[in-house]
C-alpha cells in the first residue's frame, strides 16, 4: 500500500509524535513523505521513506517543529488538481495530513476531486493545533502544551510585575489563538480570580478601549499594578489588529501594543506589551505529558484507519467526562470539520474561569498553585 503523509500549518511541540507513531506501523516501502506541507504536495516534493528518514522521524519525537517541513500555502483549487495528478502519477493509495481546520478542508477538497476523477484515493486527517479551534472534537494535540506554557508564563509574569510595581504598573500579555480564546483563557489556570490575570480578553467578545482602561484603572487603584492577558484576535472598538498578510493568510498580532499606548497616554501609567510569541508552540520544556501521549495515539489510530481502508475522516479526541478525564479516539467526518468552521470558546468558560479550568485540568499536566503560593500571597508588602 502506498501512503503519502505530510505536515501542514503552524507546528506544535508534539506534532512529530503523531508522525512518528503513524509511520512506525508501516514498512518503508509503504510510505512517501510529503515535504513542506501542501506546497510540497502541489509541487511534487515527495520522497520514499528509507531507514535514514525513519530514524530521523523517530528521533523527532522529542523535538518541536515539523520534521517534514510545514508552512503556510495558498492551496487553490487549481493547485489541488495539480497535487492529485502527482498522487495519481505515483500511484498513491492513501493521503494523510497532520494539521488544523484549514488542512482538513483541503483534504476534503482533494478527496472530492479524486472521486470526480474516479481515482480510489483514501484520505485521513490527523488533528493538531495550539489554538484549539478545530470543529467536531474536544481538543487537539498541541493545545495542551501551548496552554501549559501560557499558564506558567502568566503565573510567573504576575509575580514579577508585583515585585516591580514601583517601576512598571501595567503589563499586557498577548497570546496566540487567532479568532478563538481557548489559549488566552488558559492564562488563569490553577489560580484564584484574585491571583490570576486581572482581566482576560478573548475574540468571542467585543470590547471598547474605555472598558479595558476601566479594568486597568480598577486593578491599579486596588493594588498598584495590573496584569492583562489578551488574545491576538480580539476586536477593540470594532477593529482587529493585524501585523501583515502572507500567502493569503492574515497574520494577527499587535493588539497588546494598542492597549500599552492607550494606558500610557490616557492613564499615565508605565505599561509594557509582551507577545508570548512562538514559544507557545515550540517550548519543549513545557510539553504536557498528556498532550504528548495523545499526539502519539492519534497517529497510531490514523494508521489503523488507513490499514482498514477507511476514508474521509479526521481522528477525533473526545472525553467521557470533565471531572475524571479520559480521552477517547473516534472518527469525525472531514465534512463536519470543514463545515464547522472555527470552534469558539463557550460562554460558560468565558464567564466562569473555574469551569474552564476544570475542563483544562486533564489536558494541561500542570498542578494548580496552592493558596500559599498564589501571586500576591507570597509578598510581605
Swiss-Prot record:
UniProt KW keywords? ATP-binding, Carbohydrate metabolism, Kinase, Magnesium, Metal-binding, Nucleotide-binding, Transferase
The answer to whether UniProt assigns keyword Magnesium to this entry is yes
List the Gene Ontology MF annotations in alphabetical order: 6-phosphofructokinase activity; ATP binding; metal ion binding
* Cofactor(s) essential for the protein: Mg(2+)
Q: Which reaction does it catalyse?
A: 6-deoxy-6-sulfo-D-fructose + ATP = 6-deoxy-6-sulfo-D-fructose 1-phosphate + ADP + H(+)
Keyword Kinase on this protein? yes
Question: What's any GO biological process attached to this entry?
Answer: fructose 6-phosphate metabolic process
Q: What is its EC number?
A: 2.7.1.184
Residues binding ATP: 10, 72-73, 100-103
Listed binding positions for Mg(2+) are: 101
Ranges in a coiled coil: none
Q: Which residues form the active site?
A: 131
Read off the InterPro entries from this record. Answer: ATP_PFK, PFKA, Phosphofructokinase_dom, PKF_sf
This molecule's function is given as: Part of the sulfo-EMP2 pathway, a D-sulfoquinovose degradation pathway that produces sulfolactate (SL). Phosphorylates 6-deoxy-6-sulfo-D-fructose (SF) to 6-deoxy-6-sulfo-D-fructose 1-phosphate (SFP).
Give the family this protein belongs to, as stated in its UniProt record: Belongs to the phosphofructokinase type A (PFKA) family.
- According to UniProt, the name of this protein is Sulfofructose kinase
- What's the name of its gene? sqiK
